Amino acid sequence: MRRRLIIFFLTGYCIIPVFAQGEINEQQKIFFRNERSFAFLLNSDGYGGSYREAKRIDFLNKRFFEIEAGNIKHPREYRMQNPYYQTPGSFKYGKINGAIYLRGSIGRQHELYKKADLGGVAVRYFYSGGPTLAFYKPVYYKILYPVSAYEYQIKEEKLDVIQHPPYDIYSKAPWVKGLGETRVIPGLFIKGGVNFEYSKEEKVIHAIEAGFTLSGYLKEIPIMATTDNQAILLSLFVSYRFGVVIDPLNPETNKFSYIFKRKKATPAY
């Protein structure tokens, strides 16, 4: 996961300068640049998505509200198959609970460099914080029980690492199994990073973000049975953010569908 983060970040870092110079921007400027955007996140401990609304404070600063959700992976999770039998499914031995998070935050964004021309890059930094909830549910496994020398019975049970070695596991049970046993742990988090906004359109947002998140929960999140679990989690992230700039004079461009519209070429005569 860390290798993928490094490759993703370095690729974005190398690609963005290509857009640093371009044509003079003749598009109509939007003075009150309030923004709405979505993001896909790749974290060092999982992946997720977020929705953000940013309100203009002044020429260089914005205040934003954000909702984010994603999964939480333990660094010792490894996918494997039964070492002795050919089974169709895989599992992560030692994992007793699957965990996801839900966060809500208030933050601030400051613009360091504005776009000089069409195709330029605006550089900003941001920070935020707020409450976070970790939801976890037990993981059920399909476990092999011998009936005779050549026959086995499969039962869906929670993992007991003392009674169930890896060669007793057929595969993981369906994800919905154990959903009614979900538990929640509250906490707080802070987040910070940099934003490179490179859209060529005044009313559309395309950006790469990178930074860190530090989360603290009231108790450890019990993900693995055989490895220490933690209540304080530090993760790095990179994300792709896309959205629209709110234009009060042209409401039609405030919809997310505007991002996917393509300008029709005007034939030359």
Where are these regions (language model features)?
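Outer-membrane beta-barrel transmembrane domain signature
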Residues: 128-208, 213-229, 240-248
